[in-house]
Amino acid sequence: MELCTQTVAADHEVIITRRSGSHHPTLWGDHFLAYADLRGANEGEEKQNEDLKEEVRKMLVMAPSKSLEKLELINTIQCLGLGYHFQSEIDESLSYMYTHYEEYSIGDLHAIALCFRLLRQQGYYVSCDAFKKFTNDQGNFKEELVKDVEGMLSLYEAAQFRVHGEQILDEALNFTIAQLKQILPKLSNSQLAQQITNALKYPIKDGIVRVETRKYISFYQQNQNHNEVLLNFAKLDFNILQTLHKKELSDMTRWWKKMELVNTLPYARDRLVECYFWCLGTYFEPQYSVARKMLTKISFYISIIDDTYDIYGKLDELTLFTQAIERWNIDASEQLPLYMKIIYRDLLDVYDEIEKELANENKSFLVNYSINEMKKVVRGYFQEAKWYYGKKVPTMEQYMKNGISTSAYILLTTTSWLAMGNVATKDAFDWVATEPPIVVASCYIIRLLNDLVSHEEEQKRGNAASAVECYMNEYSVTKEEAHIKIRDIIENYWKDLNEEYFKVDMIIIPRVLLMCIINLTRVAEFIYKDEDAYTFSKNNLKDVISDILVDPII
């Protein structure tokens, strides 16, 4: 779509024909400023929270090591969003289960699948051979398994953690999806039906912790066998964390208003709250409050720069901006048009603020890792702009190679680690800068998920070719065929990601850092599930954000 807009270049006004995104305005405006004076848990809530935590800790410690009770308790604690309180206890229990895995692989379908999933989820590679006992002579899963609904659901969740070459898990996934869909209309247990419906769309492997926690608390409350201590602790903890997150968003909203970018850059998506939601999906724990704010600021600028390259900037302007980013010096802004000067100077200011904040911990040198990744992202955006203006449709190989940069996920991973403390060492930053396979798989997943749901709208306004157009052009297939193939490619990259998760040396790259990579990928799965929910947040994402960041659990 072409639009005549008046823009300022140098020191005089000129009329330039530009594309328009026609994005809807922010849905939230000043809403979160109302929480500026919000206080955390009062003394009574803090005491209640600590008391409940200790009760749950005792339950966890006292549960017999080799029991289904222990497995189900760990699973419930994690699904209720409480796992971060008991990391050492859970780690110890799962380490024990890993060393005694053969003893756990002789139970029923539910027990075996649950143990398998909990271990793989934690980074322990265990064999899937235990599921062979549930297949017949032809290698198909036995039909009588459909009577065990709980076991079927557990097998479905376990199979999501498959890697390449695990045919039995590929079959398990197809089998459970088909059977659970058939079972659903016949279930008299509405709570279980709701849980299965949610799982079929949002399996645990893909789940954003805070989103799934809110839903699981509701499911758990409906379960007649729920534990009142666990339920009360989950509700209280959810609300205490939500209060902290509201306060953080209040701070971010104040920062956003101070930037005044909305009036200066009307073409860009104004999505501060959605950016924060993305970062909250990366890590929600209270100790990462500063890290979340840093990541939100950089995410916000990635979005603005993306829109600048995608729909607004002319090639000569984008050339100047790319060169300025490479120089990374305030003097480089002098050659930029006014709107780009504002973006550039504000971006450098944000990084200066982050550097000063990290200087208190003698970690300011780490900022250069994020800056270097920002340069790579901008180079990727510029390459897409050159393809667009040159009317070139790249090959899939060319597009995907560039997609590592344009996904911005190495930049987000690197930035997410900046304020995580001593766990994020220089060795970890050096590692991620080499573009290891687990990170590349994450980049490819986000790139392709985004393209599947956004390419039609982007083509209407005249964007560069997405993966869909590249695939259609290279292989002479229809849009529908390209979609099917790209979905298969995404599934293979998830297998890559799962496989690499087991290979990474967690002494050098601790699990808490790897989870940022995995959680960023999960957010992408959620945001791009049915639509581009980031761009069109008024459709469905608004209600989810309200559940997570506005409305407490009563």
Swiss-Prot record:
Pathway: Secondary metabolite biosynthesis; terpenoid biosynthesis. One of its GO terms (biological process) is terpenoid biosynthetic process. Transmembrane segments: none annotated. Mg(2+) 3 binds at E458. Gene3D superfamilies: Farnesyl Diphosphate Synthase, Terpene synthase, N-terminal domain. Its cofactor is Mg(2+); Mn(2+). Its EC number is 4.2.3.73, 4.2.3.47, 4.2.3.106, 4.2.3.-. This is Terpene synthase 17. GO terms for molecular function: magnesium ion binding; terpene synthase activity. Mostly expressed in stem and trichomes, to a lower extent in leaves, flowers and roots and, at low levels, in fruits. Induction: Lower levels upon jasmonic acid treatment. Belongs to the terpene synthase family. Tpsa subfamily. The gene is TPS17. It comes from Solanum lycopersicum (Tomato). It catalyses: (2Z,6Z)-farnesyl diphosphate = beta-bisabolene + diphosphate; (2E,6E)-farnesyl diphosphate = (+)-valencene + diphosphate; (2E,6E)-farnesyl diphosphate = (E)-beta-farnesene + diphosphate; (2E,6E)-farnesyl diphosphate = gamma-gurjunene + diphosphate. The keyword Oxidoreductase does not apply.
